[in-house]
C-alpha cells in the first residue's frame, strides 16, 4: 500500500501525490509529518501513480481510548472547580467520539474543504505511520521569504456576526499561544525575533 498526501495552500490549486513517508534526519524541502513529541519524523517521497486510482486510506490498529459522555461531563465539572479556585488557568478538555463513515468519501471531503475555506491550508494525509488525517487551518505555521521566516499566533474563534471586542480571557489565551511560539523559536536557536501585534 502507498501513502498519500493532498494539500492546498491558500488561494492555490490542490496538490495530490502518491508515494511513501520515510524517516529522515535532515532535509532541504518537502512535506513533513511528525508525532507530538517529535521522536518520529517523516518526509514524503512521491512517485508518478494516480492519486484518485490508488487512494486507500490507512487506519492505525491501536484505537484511542473513548470515554462516555457521563465521564466526560464529570471531568468537566472537576476542571471547572480547579478553574474557580485558580489552581489552573487554561484547560482544554476533549473526548474522542467513535463514529462510522465511508472512507471512500475522503477525497470528496477534502475537495469540499478546499471550496469552503479558500484562505485556509487544507490537507488530507494518509500514512502507514500516522493513519489518516484531514483538516483545514487558517494559521500559518512557518512561511519563509529569502532569509526571513514568519509565523502566526492564532487563538480563539469569533462569530463573524459578533463584532464585540475581545474579552480579557481571549487576550490571555492569545498571549499564551504567542509566548509558546516565541519560546519554541528561541529553543530552536532563533536569536533575532521581531514581534508585531
Annotate each PLM feature.
Residues 1-12, 26, 95, 100-176:
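An anion-binding catalytic pocket shared by soluble metabolic enzymes
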Residues 11-54:
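An N-terminal, globular interaction/scaffold subdomain
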Residues 20-23, 78-79, 108-112:
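Intrinsically disordered, low-complexity boundary segments flanking structured domains
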Residues 51-70, 74-77, 100-101, 152-197:
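Contiguous alpha-helical scaffold segments within structured protein domains
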Residues 91-93:
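Divalent metal-dependent hydrolysis catalytic cores, especially in the metallo-beta-lactamase
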Amino acid at each position: 500500500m502507498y501513502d498519500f498526501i493532498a494539500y492546498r495552500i491558500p488561494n492555490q490549486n490542490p496538490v495530490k501525490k502518491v508515494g511513501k513517508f520515510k524517516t529522515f534526519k535532515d532535509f532541504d524541502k518537502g512535506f513533513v509529518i511528525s508525532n507530538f513529541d517529535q521522536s518520529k519524523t517523516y518526509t514524503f517521497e512521491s512517485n508518478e501513480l494516480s492519486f484518485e486510482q490508488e487512494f486507500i486510506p490507512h487506519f492505525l490498529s491501536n484505537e484511542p481510548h473513548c470515554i462516555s459522555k457521563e465521564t466526560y461531563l464529570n471531568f468537566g465539572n472537576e476542571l471547572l472547580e480547579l478553574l474557580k479556585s485558580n489552581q489552573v488557568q487554561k484547560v482544554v478538555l476533549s473526548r474522542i467520539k467513535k463514529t462510522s463513515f465511508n472512507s471512500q468519501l475522503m477525497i470528496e471531503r477534502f475537495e469540499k474543504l478546499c471550496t469552503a475555506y479558500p484562505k485556509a491550508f487544507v490537507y488530507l494525509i494518509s500514512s502507514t505511520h500516522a493513519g489518516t488525517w484531514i483538516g483545514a487551518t487558517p494559521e500559518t505555521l512557518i512561511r519563509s521569504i529569502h532569509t526571513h521566516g514568519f509565523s502566526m499566533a492564532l487563538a480563539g474563534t469569533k462569530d463573524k456576526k459578533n463584532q464585540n471586542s475581545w474579552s480579557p480571557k481571549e487576550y490571555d489565551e492569545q498571549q499564551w499561544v504567542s509566548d509558546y511560539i516565541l519560546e519554541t523559536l528561541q529553543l530552536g536557536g532563533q536569536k533575532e525575533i521581531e514581534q508585531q501585534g
